[in-house]
């Protein structure tokens, strides 16, 4: 099983001072690190948040965060999933189930994981899996 790592998993994996570092690292070491994926949205989110000087554990400019993440991407267990789907595809998404604009990215990531026959690994318990056809099977919520 390939796990698409949500931004809320990637950040604590790279930030050892993050409140969820132990949970993320423990799960990744035991389960997720055996076969995992990133995509343009998760990589962009990681760079955007961790390179923001207002981030509590600011680690540097985007180029520095990218270098740190590239180390992880070079793992043989890593897969890169390109953006190959659309929220407008009724074979993947039930757009009527997306009730808030803030949910769009999470639903898209869940749909991408489902499309790739993987799972979205996240700490977020609020993702509406009904917005993705077969979404419940593709959602893997990690305990904090």
Predicted regions and their residues:
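Short, well-structured N-terminal submotif of metal-dependent ribonuclease cores
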Residues: 1-38, 50-64, 132
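A generic structural signal for short hydrophobic patches within well-formed alpha-helices
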Residues: 10, 43-46, 127-128
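Acidic catalytic patch
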Residues: 16, 37-44, 66-98
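Amphipathic coiled-coil/heptad-repeat helices and related helical stalk/stem segments
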Residues: 24, 105-106
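A generic structural signal for well-ordered alpha-helical segments
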Residues: 31, 72-73, 113, 131
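Acidic, PIN/NYN-like endoribonuclease modules and their adjacent C-terminal/linker elements
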Residues: 85-99, 110-144
